[in-house]
Design a protein with these regions (language model features):
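Non-catalytic interaction-recognition regions
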Residues: 1-441
């Protein structure tokens, strides 16, 4: 409950961890606006308000027998009870108020929301939190400044009492909860609670952005310093387990990726300043990591591998980045900018020369459709696939057409415009995934 030395020490440690988390995520180009703390859901009585709603609407009932005796429970999401099980009788709750319980005896599969010792489960607090998210609770957090980014943008954190002047959070139209597939049942319970309370629209607009696990290839595990048994070396992947002490610190992974990328950059661009080479290596490394994590569908287990992620060939971030660098080099050698070419008049009759040219322009123009597909399916893998396929098409175009030595000026302008259109689509497509385009590679 706070107010003692142990609580103060705990707060000091947790705040230090949160700040380090923010710094690590910042390296990946990931930023936050607001950090809600679970403790405030109880301290600010969010749960008390949610509990009253849940009881009044009959979403929760008090169990008087069976393994859940003395608990407040709700029907587990997806559990289709028989007609005999759904018959209800009124049972007294500890507070003297009437509540309903199953007439045919206890539902042993019901989801416990409040334990018999009156402690609230994770799902219970999550229900209250989502009522706040949708502006259905009638109460708000206090807000305090917590962390400032280099551009002066502020991260806020919840508090029991906060600053009077703060941004507005909550009251959303749709909610996306990014949490792994093991939380499917708890998230379904949140949705069923919203529906049971009569908030049908909000239940439909609460999305569990589920994803599978990230593991390591044996080669990657060894590169990170782990000693593997002969048996482990033959396995397709090595699972990460915090409880077993087998894991990867995000900063260590990022550092290792940057170091590997910098070896390539140093060997190719020794004439550049070290700070420039370091920045380019970071862009390649972060791009490689983000692309690798996004190219798999959400239901796929991701077996991370350094060599595969940093490869300049195949479906990787560096492959897509290199296509942009290749296009940029064309304009540098031509003494023109891509923007100048796009501002000029382009004779599109040259599209009739080759089906591949038409397909390349068509693909470059499908960026918006790809974005809509990602949103509709909540599947970012489509963005990664789009970038790879467009880069692949552009590389085929690059090797087939001698752009800079083309003698027909109208056709040369058309070929330059083709490169400019594709370059723009690739830059925007990678930017949607949080990936920068380095000036050289």
């Amino acid at each position: 409950k706070g107010g003692n030395e142990a609580a103060e020490i705990g707060k000091l440690i947790s705040n230090a961890i949160i700040r380090r988390h923010l710094e690590t995520m910042q390296r990946l180009g990931i930023e936050y606006d607001f950090l809600p703390q679970e403790s405030e859901i109880l301290h600010l009585h969010f749960w008390d308000l949610a509990f009253e709603q849940l009881k009044q609407k009959g979403v929760l009932y008090f169990e008087t027998e069976g393994k859940n005796k003395g608990c407040w429970v709700m029907k587990r999401a997806g559990n289709k009870a028989s007609s005999s099980q759904t018959a209800k009788v009124v049972s007294p709750a500890p507070d003297g108020k009437a509540t309903e319980a199953a007439a045919e005896g206890p539902d042993e599969d019901a989801k416990v929301i409040v334990r018999s010792n009156n402690t609230v489960t994770y799902v219970g607090k999550d229900i209250a939190y989502h009522l706040w998210k949708f502006g259905l609770l009638g109460r708000d957090f206090g807000y305090q400044r917590f962390y400032r980014y280099p551009d002066s943008r502020q991260v806020w954190i919840s508090a029991e009492s906060g600053e009077a002047d703060h941004p507005h959070f909550g009251g959303v139209h749709a909610s996306y909860t990014v949490i792994d597939s093991r939380q499917e049942d708890p998230q379904n319970n949140v949705i069923e609670a919203l529906r049971g309370l009569g908030y049908t629209e909000q239940a439909e607009n609460h999305h569990h952005f589920s994803y599978a696990f990230v593991v390591l290839t044996p080669r990657c595990a060894e590169e990170l310093g782990y000693k593997l048994s002969a048996e482990d070396k033959e396995r397709p992947f090595i699972e990460i387990s915090g409880r077993k002490g087998f894991g990867v610190k995000a900063d260590d992974l990022i550092d290792a990726l940057i170091a590997a990328a910098q070896k390539e950059v140093d060997s190719r661009h020794a004439e550049m300043q070290e700070s420039e080479r370091r920045e380019i290596a970071a862009q390649i490394a972060i791009g490689a990591l983000r692309y690798f994590m996004l190219k798999f569908t959400k239901s796929s287990v991701i077996a991370f591998d350094f060599k595969e992620a940093l490869s300049f060939e195949g479906e990787t971030g560096p492959y897509a980045q290199y296509a942009i660098v290749r296009a940029t080099n064309i304009f540098r050698k031509a003494g023109l900018s891509a923007e100048e070419i796009l501002a000029g008049e382009t004779d599109l009759r040259f599209l009739q020369e080759d089906d591949e040219l038409w397909e390349l322009w068509l693909s470059a123009g499908q960026l918006s459709s790809m974005v809509e597909q990602c949103i509709a399916t909540t599947e970012p893998a489509y963005a990664a696939k789009y970038a790879f396929q467009l880069a692949q098409q552009f590389n085929n175009f690059y090797h087939k057409h001698h752009i800079l030595t083309e003698t027909d000026e109208a056709r040369k302008h058309f070929l330059l415009a083709t490169a400019a259109v594709v370059r723009r689509a690739l830059i925007e497509g990678l930017a949607l995934m949080g990936i920068d385009a380095p000036p050289v590679m």
